[in-house]
Amino acid sequence: MMNLQGKKITVHDMTLRDGMHPKRHLMTLDQMKSIASGLDAAGVPLIEVTHGDGLGGSSVNYGFPAHSDEEYLGAVIPLMKQAKVSALLLPGIGTVDHLLMAKDLGVHTVRVATHCTEADVSEQHISKARSLEMDTVGFLMMAHMASPEKLVSQALLMEGYGANCIYVTDSAGYMLPDDVTVRLRAVRGALKPETELGFHGHHNLAMGVANSIAAVDAGANRIDAAAAGLGAGAGNTPMEVFIAVCDRMGIATGVDVFRIQDVAEDLVVPIMDHIIRVDRDSLTLGYAGVYSSFLLFAKRAEKKYGVPAREILVELGRRGMVGGQEDMIEDTAMTLARERAAAAHKAAA
């Protein structure tokens, strides 16, 4: 029987960063400010604000945002009464200059994200963030693709570069609670006791809350979630549900159970371009182990090439595509469309 009574955790909000994916990075400054202020008032201690793909994500490959990272951060940070603001940075997209800009604007936490087997590309960014005395997080994405032993080796690299917290990230929403437990226990056992451990979930198999609780039980003390689940795929772990479950279990989050519901219902749901839910395409992300932010790219390719998004996503999973290969989605759709046309031609002959 799990007993987490009295355990303290830090909840990290994703609404204004992972939530940029389903908004196609087009949140307005007013939307950002009102949601961030609501989260702050609800007691959320850490709020991530950047382009969905992190600092410097504005590009043809990832999508152009309504405003620059500087504008979003500059609008939100001065409004915060108790919450700190974090920024995501993917080496190869974000640079040390972006990191310095974020620090100058008052960003407290930087999360340096790599594919779960490529931690070595994070050294420059992690060591720089630590030298700036920032709260520095190593963020291992698509963690279902690596064994617990491999994740341990990658986590130790990031810790060695200076990260004071390591995240195991279920970018595809593929993991089940046992997958989370075995990975987080292994990483927790290998890290220094003072190094924190985090978990980032997606709700593609509706496991976001269960996986996050499993993570806490395995030793995680930072958990990502989003108000109304606003995030890529079927969204992140829905914050208001997670907070209610924590409250029931006696896990201390410092977040007000009812205020966070109001933020989700009154501020986040009304700005959704589509309802964030487990539909056949987002379910396929979780089932096939595909990067959650590929969802809208696959839906777009379906319209363009007439190949169902689900087929595209299954093929991407078969090919083992990872974050950063967004350009290959179109390529995959074209290949499948050609194969379909050839099969139809053969059948007609």
From Swiss-Prot:
Domain Pyruvate carboxyltransferase per the UniProt entry, residue ranges: 9-261
InterPro entries: 2-IPM_HCS-like, 4OH_2_O-val_aldolase, Aldolase_TIM, DmpG_comm, DRE_TIM_HOA, PYR_CT
Record family assignment: Belongs to the 4-hydroxy-2-oxovalerate aldolase family.
PANTHER family: 2-ISOPROPYLMALATE SYNTHASE 1, CHLOROPLASTIC-RELATED, HOMOCITRATE SYNTHASE-RELATED
KW Nucleotide-binding (keyword) present: no
GO molecular function: 2-isopropylmalate synthase activity; 4-hydroxy-2-oxovalerate aldolase activity; manganese ion binding
UniProt xrefs under Pfam families: DmpG_comm (PF07836), HMGL-like (PF00682)
E.C. number: 4.1.3.39
Keywords recorded for this protein, A-Z: Aromatic hydrocarbons catabolism, Lyase, Manganese, Metal-binding
The protein's name in its UniProt record: 4-hydroxy-2-oxovalerate aldolase 1
Catalytic residues as annotated in Swiss-Prot or TrEMBL: H21
Site feature (Transition state stabilizer) residues: R17
HAMAP family xrefs: HOA
Superkingdom in the source lineage: Bacteria
Organism for this UniProt entry: Methylibium petroleiphilum (strain ATCC BAA-1232 / LMG 22953 / PM1)
Binding site for substrate: R17, D18, S171, H200, Y291
NCBIfam families in the record: 4OH_2_O_val_ald, PRK08195.1
GO biological process, one term: catabolic process
First-tier enzyme category under EC: lyase
Positions annotated to bind Mn(2+): D18, H200, H202
CDD domains: DRE_TIM_HOA (cd07943)
Keyword Nucleus: no
